[in-house]
């Protein structure tokens, strides 16, 4: 839902630390002047403006929940500027939901105004985009199948509650692991902080960043707690975080 949460006046929602002000989670990959966005959140327009995004070459979707797809219509300026359709990569299930949710984009009714121009690509294994090998990493978001993505020595896994051993095998030798850690209390569709730490113990990335963070977790105090618990290599991600990835 983002932080601050509407109608909430808790300590984190009232925090003056800009790192406690969180839009919905998304990632921008930049390689050799080309860019890929993972998930077009409801905050996509503001996120793109914040980083000065002027070119978009592809979109990857982890799954089709509202907080990950509802910024889809805001890709139109990139179509107009680049005079090209954008490739979209997602699972068959996610593509089906996109077609249903944004029916005006995909039906055959003539559009009165501009609509997003895309080409759809169902993910069924590793693929290449902007000169980078993308490895899909299947996981479970409650009863729902979702995809994480590995690119070089980094991986991004948001919105998941469990991950099979076959997917864990795809995550060996990581420099950076970005993973779901919603809060301390159990949730049927997300990892807790302790579950995320257990996966960090198992996979042993050089660094780990927690994302999809609810308003129960304050940035500075949670990071201090992680250090005290013996995890100096783990921290909460924050809006605007950027780092280089070894491909």
What are these regions (language model features)?
Residues 1-157, 223-246:
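Binuclear metal-dependent hydrolase catalytic cores
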Residues 44, 163-164:
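Short, surface-exposed beta-strand-loop junctions and turns on beta-sheet-rich folds
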Residues 136-137, 157-159, 179-180, 211:
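Thr-Gly-centered strand-to-loop micro-motif
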Residues 164-247:
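Binuclear metal-ion centers of metallo-dependent hydrolases, dominated by the metallo-beta-lactamase
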């Amino acid at each position: 839902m983002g932080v601050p949460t509407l109608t909430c006046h808790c300590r984190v929602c009232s925090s003056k630390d800009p790192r406690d002000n969180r839009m919905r989670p998304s990632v921008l990959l930049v390689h050799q002047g080309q860019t890929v966005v993972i998930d077009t959140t409801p905050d996509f327009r503001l996120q793109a403006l914040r980083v000065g995004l002027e070119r978009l070459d592809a979109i990857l979707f982890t799954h089709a929940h509202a907080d990950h797809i509802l910024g889809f219509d805001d890709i139109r300026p990139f179509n107009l500027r680049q005079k090209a359709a954008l490739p979209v990569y997602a699972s068959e299930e996610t593509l089906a939901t996109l077609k249903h949710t944004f029916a005006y984009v995909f039906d055959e009714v003539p559009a009165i105004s501009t609509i997003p121009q895309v080409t759809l690509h169902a993910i069924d294994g590793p693929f290449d985009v902007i000169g980078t090998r993308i490895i899909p990493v299947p996981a479970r978001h409650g009863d729902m199948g979702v995809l994480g993505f590995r690119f070089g020595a980094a991986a991004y896994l948001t919105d998941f509650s469990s991950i099979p051993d076959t997917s864990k095998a795809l995550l060996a030798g990581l420099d950076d692991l970005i993973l779901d850690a919603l809060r301390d209390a159990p949730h049927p569709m997300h990892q807790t902080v302790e579950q995320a730490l257990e996966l960090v113990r198992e996979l042993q990335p050089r660094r780990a960043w927690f994302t999809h963070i609810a308003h129960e977790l304050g940035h500075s105090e949670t990071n201090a707690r992680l250090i005290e618990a013996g995890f100096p290599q783990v921290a909460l991600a924050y809006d605007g975080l950027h780092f280089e990835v070894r491909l």
